[in-house]
Every structure is written in C-alpha cells, then in structure tokens.
C-alpha cells in the first residue's frame, strides 16, 4: 500500500512538472540572422522579441530573446514581438 501511494505521488509530481514546461515559451536567442538558438523563457515572459537598431560603422544590428511586454519602437530602435514558439 505504501508503495502504491509513493508511486502515485511521484507520478503526480512528474505530471505537474511536465504541465508547467508545456506552457513555457521558446524563443530564438541568437543575434545572428542565419543561426537559431532556442531558449526557454521564464514563466512571466510570454513574448519573443527582436530589437533592431543602427550602429555607426556596423549598420543594422539585432538582439532577440524573451520579454514580458513589447516596448514601443522608436526611430532608432525597432521592436517586433510575437507569442508563439520561435516566431521571430
């Protein structure tokens, strides 16, 4: 009986943990356009983003990753956000 109870507890913990990871967003974390690096976002980060900005001498540069809300674009920084896995 103790073994059955212990087994049920372990199965419950594993299932709950899998449920939490199923709701986790994955975003591309690479700053190189031709390379994708998958990164698991934190629970409060529900968006993937790409920020593009101009750097004198280098041209347009991008930074990608996870974020909790999408900032507004400015003339010098352009943001794109989306809410599905590896969407940017």
Swiss-Prot record:
Cellular component, GO annotation: extracellular region
User: Which Pfam families does the entry link to?
Assistant: Toxin_cobra-type
| UniProt keywords, alphabetically | Acetylcholine receptor inhibiting toxin, Disulfide bond, Neurotoxin, Postsynaptic neurotoxin, Secreted, Signal, Toxin
* Cited InterPro entries: Snake_3FTx, Snake_toxin-like_sf, Snake_toxin_con_site, Toxin_cobra-type
Give the domain of life: Eukaryota
User: What is the tissue specificity?
Assistant: Expressed by the venom gland.
Q: Which cysteines are joined by disulfide bonds?
A: 27-48, 41-66, 70-81, 82-87
Locations listed in the record: Secreted
GO terms of molecular function: acetylcholine receptor inhibitor activity; toxin activity
Q: Tell me which positions the record assigns to the signal sequence.
A: 1-21
Relate the protein's function as given in its record: Binds with low affinity to muscular (alpha-1-beta-1-delta-epsilon/CHRNA1-CHRNB1-CHRND-CHRNE) and very low affinity to neuronal (alpha-7/CHRNA7) nicotinic acetylcholine receptor (nAChR).
Q: Which family, according to the similarity comment?
A: Belongs to the three-finger toxin family. Ancestral subfamily. Orphan group II sub-subfamily.
UniProt-recorded name of the protein: Three-finger toxin 3FTx-2
Identify the species of origin. Answer: Micrurus corallinus (Brazilian coral snake)
């Amino acid at each position: 009986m103790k073994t059955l109870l212990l087994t049920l507890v372990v199965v419950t913990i594993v299932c709950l943990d899998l449920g939490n990871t199923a709701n986790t967003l994955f975003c591309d974390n690479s700053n190189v356009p031709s390379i994708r690096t998958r990164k698991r976002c934190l629970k409060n980060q529900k968006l993937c983003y790409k920020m593009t900005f101009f750097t004198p001498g280098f041209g347009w540069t991008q930074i990608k990753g996870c974020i909790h809300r999408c900032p507004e674009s400015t003339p010098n920084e352009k943001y794109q956000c989306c809410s599905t896995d590896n969407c940017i």
